[in-house]
């Protein structure tokens, strides 16, 4: 049974008008236990924001690791996506990719930093995503290394178009990425084809390491679904947020 302390959480909804996307985008913001506007906090930005809260149970997990497992209190920002245009926004070959990444870095980040006491160092901003959300998080770091240096990727959809972009980078020694993929993800049917996610993640790990990135990489029994990712979220968050 879940400890009742983990269920008492503060989540705020915001709406941002994006000129890049030409529409409004909903943000869901988690504030940690003991939240105080006079303090400052690390921040985790999640792609597929609604799913991270609803299926990943990230707010409950955050409470638990902050209250009982030594995580530094942190803020979470979940960025909503319309599933019907998710691939267009998250994949580098998508027709909304440039607009989405610009919105994320140039509109969402300044909006949050103006309204909430989040820290502004690249080491205090973490990008998190599953599947295509993992790959677009890595793209964001490469596009805006002055903003992002830390990435959580769960079963990243590192298609060849993404790998070619990553491979073009010469020095990634500034990047730290936590990666996991499920061993049962060898033939996952995505909207653009069927892919061996284990091989995609191994190849991406190798090319990142060759360019100097700090990579924490794991393969575990699991499928391409939230039941797997939810269980791995605590370790992913603690990797970057454990108070030392």
Feature names for model-found ranges:
Residues 1-244:
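Non-catalytic cap/lid and distal C-terminal segments of serine-dependent acyl enzymes
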